[in-house]
């Protein structure tokens, strides 16, 4: 009887002790596939901290090759504005007219960079730790000066994320219509 109880206890410890490593390996395998692809497209709803005020944006993000573009879809006052990053340069435009890069309120990280920064962390970020909660998985990643927490569904499609710097949440991102190739 004691052997059976000891065996059951040992198996429980072995199985639960392997879960964090299994989660890490599954994420790293997914990250390698994403890094081996050429890009992704997704919709992002972003909440940005702009000097103590939370500002909400929505946009379509396309990351392909060395180019990233974000077209804002909400709020209505900025819908249609596009941000593009390629070859180390950035442009902000509306109907082919280049706009000033930092008009009005500024955030520590531009809301236009939320989607691309989130994608870069998924693709290149250093895995710190992660876990599971029911059908969702979480990975916490380091990318330069940022810490990015990403939440995935059971099929490893990103659902949401949080971008932090120095323990302060700068941006939160809700992901929809994820597609990678």
Locate each region found by the language model.
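Hydrophobic-ligand binding "helix-grip"
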Residues: 42, 71, 149
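An acidic-aromatic
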Residues: 62-119, 169-171
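Flexible, processing/modification-adjacent segments and terminal tails
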Residues: 35, 46-48, 93-146
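Short, surface-exposed charged micro-motifs
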Residues: 58-60, 80-84, 147-151
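Beta-strand elements of well-folded, non-transmembrane domains
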Residues: 46-52, 63-67, 74-76, 154, ...
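N-terminal leader/targeting segments and the immediate start of mature chains
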Residues: 11-62, 181
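Positively charged n-region of N-terminal signal peptides that target proteins for export
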Residues: 1-4
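Gly/Pro-enriched, hydrophobic low-complexity segments
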Residues: 127-181
């Amino acid at each position: 009887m004691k052997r059976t109880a000891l065996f059951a206890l040992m198996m429980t410890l072995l199985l639960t002790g392997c879960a964090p490593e299994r989660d890490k390996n599954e994420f790293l395998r997914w990250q390698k596939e994403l890094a081996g692809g050429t890009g992704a497209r997704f919709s992002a709803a972003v909440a940005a901290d702009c000097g103590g005020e939370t500002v909400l944006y929505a946009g379509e993000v396309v990351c392909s090759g060395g180019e990233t573009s974000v077209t804002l879809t909400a709020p209505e006052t900025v819908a249609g504005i596009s941000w593009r990053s390629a070859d180390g340069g950035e442009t902000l435009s509306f109907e082919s007219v280049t706009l000033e890069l930092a008009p009005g309120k500024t955030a520590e990280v531009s809301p236009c960079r939320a989607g691309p920064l989130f994608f870069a962390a998924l693709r290149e970020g250093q895995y710190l730790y992660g876990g599971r909660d029911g059908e969702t998985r979480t990975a916490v990643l380091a990318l330069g000066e940022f810490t990015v927490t990403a939440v995935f569904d059971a099929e490893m499609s990103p659902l949401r994320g949080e971008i932090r710097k120095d323990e302060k949440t700068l941006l939160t991102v809700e992901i929809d219509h994820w597609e990678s190739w």
